[in-house]
Amino acid sequence: MPNDIRVLLLGGTGRTGGRVLARLLERGVEVRAIVRSARRLEPGTANDTRLTAVEADPLSLPRDELLELVRGCDAVVSCLGHNTDLGGIFGPPRDLVARMTRRACGAVAVLRPAEPVKFVLMSSVSVNRPDRLDTRRGAIERAAVALLRGLVPPAKDNQDAADFLCSEIGQADRFVRWVAVRPDTLVEGDGSGYALHEGLVSSLARPDKTSMANVARFMCELVTDPRAWDEWAGRMPVIVDAAVSV
Ligand SMILES: NC(=O)c1ccc[n+]([C@@H]2O[C@H](COP(=O)([O-])OP(=O)(O)OC[C@H]3O[C@@H](n4cnc5c(N)ncnc54)[C@H](OP(=O)(O)O)[C@@H]3O)[C@@H](O)[C@H]2O)c1
């Protein structure tokens, strides 16, 4: 079990982020979590001695404080997402995920770590890979997704965050390496097994299911298993539930 890995977790009070937090702690990882309210942490994790929870709005956390939280971390994991009420979907901050991705990567760049820091982003199958690499998505579906982005701010936010990683961090950054994990429709369930794909496998009209437990498990693998990291770094894997464990 890794006992010398340190992670900054964003969105650790969320449905998937809470599961990521539990899995990381189970694996002996030291976690720093920026949360708006520590009361929203699962009771089983809130008192874990390996967890440091900082109560703050991550977007307005002063830069120096963010730097101190990022300093010494091997990875930053973001499970941020807009709350699903009207205010969360259409109100500010419309750029929650993208802006926090920029902030966290910017903090890493300021710190100039000797080894690149891993940035693991929870993304979505609604997010396209650049250069039309998702060949499964034809013109009609691309138009539907573009419309979705125009109408629903979180969809644009998720695309902007991934675009930032692909285009501005890219593949050769000295300080940040990244993976954007793309689940399909999130469901409950024990996450007994999952399949990973380079690109999209289902259409938006006939979506697959991805249990949050599986997303959490894979995000933790990326942080703790160098082979998983080497396989997926700089890529945007699609994760869906599978009958057979991987
Ligand atoms: N729903 C799906 O089927 C689906 C499929 C694929 C991908 N995704 C993506 O997966 C990601 C995570 O989904 P989820 O359902 O696990 O998320 P979730 O349960 O809604 O959790 C969202 C997290 O973001 C935080 N957050 C929300 N608004 C914030 C704000 N203004 N400032 C700071 N923190 C804020 C929440 O904090 P609080 O606890 O304080 O509210 C919570 O920790 C999202 O980006 C979503 O788009 C969703």
Describe the predicted segments one by one.
Residues 10, 34, 79-80, 119-125, ...:
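SDR active-site strand-loop-helix element
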Residues 33, 39-103, 110:
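NAD(P)H-binding glycine-rich loop region in Rossmannoid oxidoreductase-like domains
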Residues 87, 91, 102-152:
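Conserved Rossmann-fold NAD(P)-dependent oxidoreductase catalytic core, especially the SDR/UDP-sugar
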Residues 129-133, 190-195, 224-234:
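Glycine/proline-rich active-site loop of Rossmann-fold NAD(P)-dependent oxidoreductases
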Residues 162-188:
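Conserved beta-loop-beta element that borders a ligand/cofactor-binding pocket
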